Curated annotation (Swiss-Prot):
Source organism: Mus musculus
The protein's name in its UniProt record: E3 ubiquitin-protein ligase CBL-B
Modifications made to the protein after synthesis: Phosphorylated on tyrosine and serine residues upon TCR or BCR activation. Phosphorylated on Tyr-664 and Tyr-708 in adipocytes following insulin stimulation. Auto-ubiquitinated upon EGF-mediated cell activation or upon T-cell costimulation by CD28; which promotes proteasomal degradation.
Domain comment (free text): The N-terminus is composed of the phosphotyrosine binding (PTB) domain, a short linker region and the RING-type zinc finger. The PTB domain, which is also called TKB (tyrosine kinase binding) domain, is composed of three different subdomains: a four-helix bundle (4H), a calcium-binding EF hand and a divergent SH2 domain. The RING-type zinc finger domain mediates binding to an E2 ubiquitin-conjugating enzyme.
Bias type Basic residues, positions: 906-922
Length: 982
């Protein structure tokens, strides 16, 4: 065996037999007694090592060497090692931490080994002299081998000290069986002497002789320091998997196989195969020096070319068997005898994944199954990525890797190995069946629950999705979230706002996660239409049961442009989509709620939208559950997307109601929706409409349909994406108008409150068609600073206020406005203005953000100063109302921009004019403006606040008497107002 290995290893000690015998004796002694104790690796020792490394670099820079810039390139490796050591020292800069580092067992051994290897390289130059410049000399080969060792040491220090912080005790071994062995014998140790390791390994896998032990050490000890680190052990177990037959595999592949080359580089493999260029099928294999833990196989093609490849997702013996069958790997190292490796292919038991009842219920709610691959939604999961543990189907993994995808498609972790798995389906019980029947099957499919990492990776699936089926996006009712499957397993920190709703859904924690997954799903840029979002493609490949009509296709210009239809996932109403005109059908939540644009509030908005999505067939209970779960998830999403609060200006609402921007991912409710009880009571107070709305809250779907049935509100509700209740719908409509879909989106409190009256009116009038990007926030009645601090509370207030205001408004509006008069496309100026608005205005900032208010502030400050609104109400609602009112008008055009034919009430222009006058440059005739101003002044003279007067006039279409009756009923804070402060 030793002879065969020497023959295949040009770096063997055959050049100097006497020296080789001496070194062999030294190795035997060290193997028997173990390595000496290491001195502390203090700063002085590290700096001394740096000097030695620098000397090696200078020697290697001699032009006579003519080193090739190919791996392993020592002139890159040593400087990188130096930089990483500097990073480590910077993390342990103070005296106490530095003392801990200098006493770290692994670090001491590493520095000592690095110093010895550097001295050895220097000595090599001194002894080799001119022979070092001969490319085929043994001394030059020894330098190449040292380069490989330095390369292994660099990879090891980066793995044990990622980002300069010691993580050796937390290092994750890829193979579960191997990890169990290490934990059992060595606990959390990072490195152990070879002698100790050999004894422990012998207890599990018998080592037949001392000669075999020496050969095994030369294979495992990649850094040649007489120690085995957890990193080296992980590499070895990945190379010669599976663990159950690891020594047998090693004997077949490394000891006796003529194709195995130890410590060879890419260039050396190419040079070695050059002599077999006339013998196609000749091959050799080596450890990849750039991807430790994987094999590199070099072979001669039929036309005499030499190629090298790294097999993925299969053991080496399987790759060699497959290549032999295909005619690629026939002659190992040019020899006619090709070992038969089929004996290593003993069927290994698949890892069985048991589906828990909780997972079963969760996936029932989504209308999917745990077994289904969440990337393609076509095949069952049959492979597990190691070490992260994500599950998917083999075809998706292969497509991802062939598209040059780096790391796990879910979490971006390095793929160190894969394991075949079988998912054992859960045997449905009565509870599970009941859960499935309650939840709409069109709920968003969630990510696998098998992932621990909650990473943004928000880009992770875009590439794979595009590789898979980009064209199916529009047709598929469902989109897979971008978050990692395992991430779903981890329950998010409960948001205080979510807490009231957690008990409603059948599986509250999971529903929250669903929302979370939705928001996280990678979507097109804010300016891109939801349809074009690659993330949408992934799950749409395979629609969930009874897929609704394509939600993403923009419907023909609706009578009222759908503001932001509820997400396919969240809205259970999509089922009803069949009964609703295509334009009315809500868009998928992804399209509706741009997580980035809306931020936290958007998430809430998304919940609302989803809840509001029309679905007549859904029971009240299901709608309530969906609503609350969505609300909870929105909060989760809000947390995650606060950084995205501002949607880009480009965000536009399409005729189908989709936001062109990321906003489409998370529609309207910015603020955590007030408890359902608060929303419903407010609705009930408003009257029959409110009652219907409260019922709708229970049946988001049913309620939405009902509202749609109401003529004036019909276009509005459709556009606005049915929300949990009227309150919700109104907020949604606001988003349509250009408010972040929901009143809550902008300063949910203020907006929602104001939007309660104007929004309803707007929706009745068709204003709901405004796009989120177009929103022109009206100046907050109160100074923006007040609104911004109260965003969170205002959001809560907004829903209740909106509900209270909406019912009466809804009644009036419904009576006054024709249900389906589609106004002509909004003037170009509106769309332009809305588009020109700052991104903040276009995407209403979440309840916690002032971005949306900022644009309105400049216009509204004077106004707000003139008429202070009641503190309880205005704090949250005034700015929102003003913004919303103006945005409703302005955004109607913007939504029309997206669709070019937003449905509007018969008199949209006057409403726009009023808001525009205050919020933007007046676009309407001066006479009309003066007329509106006179009416506003008249009503303000009666003691009403400016914003309320403005909203009332907008709803009443500038009819003073109707506006006065509205103000009498809604001018003062409704009985629910205390809830706004919650």
């Amino acid at each position: 065996m030793a002879n065969s290995m020497n023959g295949r290893n040009p770096g063997g000690r055959g050049g100097n037999p006497r020296k080789g015998r001496i070194l062999g004796i030294i190795d035997a002694i060290q193997d028997a007694v173990g390595p000496p104790k290491q001195a502390a690796a203090d700063r002085r020792t590290v700096e001394k090592t740096w000097k030695l490394m620098d000397k090696v670099v200078r020697l290697c820079q001699n032009p006579k060497l003519q080193l090739k810039n190919s791996p392993p390139y020592i002139l890159d490796i040593l400087p990188d090692t130096y930089q990483h050591l500097r990073l480590i020292l910077s993390k342990y800069d103070d005296n106490q931490k530095l003392a801990q580092l200098s006493e770290n067992e692994y670090f001491k051994i590493y520095i000592d080994s690095l110093m010895k290897k550097s001295k050895r390289a220097i000595r090599l130059f001194k002894e080799g002299k001119e022979r070092m410049y001969e490319e085929q000399s043994q001394d030059r080969r020894n330098l190449t081998k040292l380069s490989l060792i330095f390369s292994h040491m660099l990879a090891e220090i980066k793995a044990i000290f990622p980002n300069g912080q010691f993580q050796g005790d937390n290092f994750r071994i890829t193979k579960a069986d191997a990890a169990e062995f290490w934990r059992k014998f060595f606990g959390d140790k990072t490195i152990v002497p070879w002698k100790v390791f050999r004894q422990c390994l012998h207890e599990v896998h018998q080592i037949s002789s001392g000669l075999e032990a020496m050969a095994l050490k030369s294979t495992i000890d990649l850094t040649c320091n007489d120690y085995i680190s957890v990193f080296e052990f992980d590499i070895f177990t990945r190379l010669f998997q599976p663990w159950g037959s690891i020594l047998r595999n090693w004997n077949f592949l490394a000891v006796t196989h003529p194709g195995y080359m130890a410590f060879l580089t890419y260039d050396e493999v190419k040079a070695r195969l050059q002599k077999y260029s006339t013998k196609p099928g000749s091959y050799i294999f080596r450890l990849s020096c750039t991807r430790l833990g994987q094999w590199a196989i070099g072979y001669v093609t039929g036309d005499g070319n030499i190629l090298q490849t790294i097999p993925h997702n299969k053991p080496l013996f399987q790759a060699l068997i497959d290549g032999s069958r295909e005619g690629f790997y026939l002659y190992p190292d040019g020899r006619s005898y090709n070992p038969d490796l089929t004996g290593l292919c003993e069927p290994t038991p698949h890892d069985h994944i048991k589906v828990t009842q909780e997972q079963y219920e969760l996936y029932c709610e989504m209308g999917s199954t745990f077994q289904l691959c969440k990337i393609c939604a076509e095949n069952d999961k049959d492979v597990k990525i190691e070490p992260c543990g994500h599950l998917m189907c083999t075809s998706c993994l292969t497509a991802w890797q062939e598209s040059d995808g780096q790391g796990c498609p879910f979490c971006r972790c390095e793929i160190k190995g894969t394991e075949p798995i079988i998912v054992d389906p859960f045997d449905p019980r009565d509870e599970g069946s009941r859960c499935c029947s309650i939840i709409d099957p069109f709920s968003i499919p969630m990510l696998d629950l098998d992932d621990d990492d909650d990473r943004e990776e928000s880009l992770m699936m875009n590439r794979l999705a595009s590789v898979r089926k980009c064209t199916d996006r529009q047709n598929s009712p469902v989109t897979s979230p971008g978050s990692s499957p395992l991430a779903q397993r981890r329950k998010p920190q409960p948001d205080p706002l979510q807490i009231p709703h957690l008990s409603l859904p059948p599986v509250p924690p999971r529903l929250d996660l669903i929302q979370k997954g939705i928001v996280r799903s990678p979507c097109g840029s804010p300016t891109g239409s939801p349809k074009s979002s690659p993330c949408m493609v992934r799950k749409q490949d395979k629609p969930l049961p009874a897929p609704p009509p394509p939600l993403r296709d923009p419907p023909p210009p609706p009578e009222r442009p759908p503001p932001i239809p509820p997400d396919n996932r969240l809205s259970r109403h999509f089922h009803h989509g069949e009964s609703v005109p295509s334009r009315d059908q809500p868009m998928p939540l992804e399209a509706w709620c741009p997580r980035d644009a809306f931020g936290t509030n958007q998430v809430m908005g998304c919940r609302i939208l989803g809840d509001g999505s029309p679905k007549p067939g859904v029971t009240a209970n299901s709608s309530l559950n969906g609503r609350h779960s969505r609300m909870g998830s929105e909060q989760v999403l809000m947390r995650k997307h606060r950084r995205h609060d501002l949607p880009s200006e480009g965000a536009k609402v399409f005729s189908n109601g989709h936001l062109a921007t990321e906003e489409y991912d998370v529609p309207p409710r910015l603020s955590p929706p007030p408890p359902v009880t608060t929303l419903l009571p407010s609705i009930k107070c408003t009257g029959p409409l409110a009652n219907c709305l409260s019922e709708k809250t229970r049946d988001t779907v049913e309620d939405d349909d009902d509202e749609y049935k109401i003529p004036s509100s019909h276009p509005v509700s459709l556009n606005s994406q049915p929300s949990h209740c009227h309150n919700v719908k109104a907020p949604v409509r606001s988003c349509d108008n250009g408010h972040c879909i929901l009143n809550g989106t902008h300063g949910a409190p203020s907006e929602m409150k104001k939007s309660n009256i104007p929004d309803l009116g707007i929706y009745l009038k068709g204003g709901g068609s405004d796009s989120a990007s177009d929103p022109v926030p009206l100046p907050p009645a109160r100074p923006p600073p007040r609104d911004s601090p109260k965003h969170g509370s205002s959001v809560n207030r907004t829903p209740s206020d909106y509900d209270l205001l909406i019912p009466p408004l809804g009644e009036d509006a419904f009576d006054a406005l024709p249900p389906s008069l589609p106004p002509p496309p909004p003037p170009a100026r509106h769309s332009l203005i809305e588009h020109s608005k700052p991104p903040g205005s276009s995407s209403r900032p979440s309840s916690g953000q002032d971005l949306f208010l900022l644009p309105s502030d400049p216009f509204f400050d004077p106004t707000s100063g003139q008429v202070p609104l009641p503190p309880a109400r205005r704090a949250a609602g005034d700015s929102g109302k003003a913004n919303r009112a103006s945005q409703d008008y302005d955004q109607l055009p913007s939504s029309s921009d997206g669709s070019q034919a937003p449905a509007r009430p018969p008199k949209p222009r006057p409403r726009r004019t009023a808001p525009e006058i205050h919020h933007r440059k007046p676009h309407g005739p001066e006479a009309a403006l003066e007329n509106v101003d006179a009416k506003i002044a008249k009503l303000m003279g009666e003691g009403y606040a400016f914003e309320e007067v403005k909203r009332a006039l907008e709803i009443a279409q500038n009819n003073v008497e109707v506006a006065r009756s509205i103000l009498r009923e809604f001018a003062f804070p409704p009985p629910v107002s205390p809830r706004l402060n919650l």
